[in-house]
Regions:
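Short, contiguous pre-domain boundary segments
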Residues: 1-11, 162
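Rieske [2Fe-2S] iron-sulfur-binding domain
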Residues: 39-140, 146-154
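Short, solvent-exposed coil/turn linker segments
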Residues: 8-9, 21, 34-35, 116, ...
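Non-catalytic accessory segments flanking enzyme active sites
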Residues: 13-50
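Generic structural signal for secondary-structure transition and capping sites
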Residues: 26-30, 77, 190
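C-terminal catalytic domain of Rieske-type non-heme iron oxygenases
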Residues: 58-59, 64, 70, 128-129, ...
Length: 311
């Protein structure tokens, strides 16, 4: 029998290791930004920092969803500082103005004949939209995301992400390495001890893990009698998908969560929970679901931070 070995604990606290991960993993992976539901109107935009790169995703209606580096082409100043809505993008440093499609509209202090405006448009980022979810990649040599998402789509059918409406985003700053959080998510062995309520909701004996080329799936049946999910019956399942390296889909009856895990430094990370529901009018069920989810998340935060201390 072969003996398994774990990686050295320093990989969970060494800034040099994180630098290697950013250069060789995060820079070469697809990233989830959010949903079209979060920017439904013309001029709505979200800002993100992905692998230390400032990014803006904006709805210009005419051309649809655009994704750019959130950087002025004049002197490199970050353009937009928080999510919002705007008719145009104006740099607060020297006043250069861009249209919502990224084209340079006005360069304060310069005449049009002085500059090649086409060369000074905002730098676009390749993106892919699947069931209203917006993904981007910073480099060309990433895995085949459309193929991966099609596989997931086939597994969860007839469930469709675009039948769920965005409700809100909850952010957590956690004092653990991003891999500690991922390691914890990727195993259900701790559930009976760390998550007593979740253990009553799921059928732990049915808990299974399946490995695919670019993602993994953990799934189990749900106990209808103890479930907080309104649409639960004896055939209901919970699905937990992991898309390498840091995208999670949590699917339960009537509810979808997407999670994004982003390293802050070698010993802390940000985790973003986006909540989606089929029935936005059933506020009582939504609140019950959110309260249950936050209880589970707080249990995970506690155990992950304890692990980080001990590494």
């Amino acid at each position: 029998m072969l003996r398994d070995k774990t990686i050295t604990s320093s990989w969970y606290s060494d800034e040099k290791i994180l630098k290697i991960e950013k250069e060789n993993i995060f820079s070469k992976s697809w990233h989830l930004l959010g949903s079209i539901d979060q920017i439904p109107n013309k001029g709505d935009y979200l800002i993100k920092t992905i692998n230390e790169q400032p990014i803006v995703v904006i709805n210009d209606i005419v051309g649809g969803i655009n994704v750019f580096y959130n950087v002025c082409q004049h002197r490199g100043c970050v353009l937009l500082e928080k999510d919002g809505n705007s008719k145009q993008i104006k740099c607060g440093y020297h006043g250069w103005v861009y249209e919502l499609n990224g084209k340079l509209k006005a360069a304060r202090g310069f005449d049009k004949e002085d500059l090649d405006f086409e060369e000074l448009n905002l730098k676009s980022i390749e993106h892919y939209i699947w069931m209203n979810q917006i993904f981007i990649k910073l480099q060309s040599d990433c895995n085949n995301l459309p193929k991966t998402l099609k596989e997931i789509e086939n597994i969860i059918s007839p469930i469709k992400f675009d039948n769920y409406l965005f409700h809100f985003r909850k952010s957590y700053k956690i004092k653990c390495n991003w891999k500690v959080y991922m390691d914890n998510y990727l195993e259900g062995f701790h559930i009976p001890l760390v998550h007593p309520k979740l253990n009553r909701v799921i059928d732990y004996k049915s808990y299974s893990t399946e490995i695919f080329d670019n993602f993994s799936l953990q799934w189990c049946h749900i106990n209808a009698e103890s479930s907080p999910y309104k649409k639960t019956d004896d055939t209901s399942k919970a699905y937990y998908f992991t898309l390498f390296p840091n995208i999670l889909f949590n699917i339960a009856p009537g509810r979808l969560q997407t999670n994004i895990i982003e390293p802050i430094n070698a010993s802390s990370c940000n985790v973003y929970f986006d909540y989606y529901f089929e029935n936005e009018e059933d506020l009582e069920s939504i609140q019950e679901d959110i309260s249950f989810s936050e209880e589970v998340q707080n249990e995970d935060i506690n155990i992950c931070e304890r692990i980080q201390i001990g590494l």
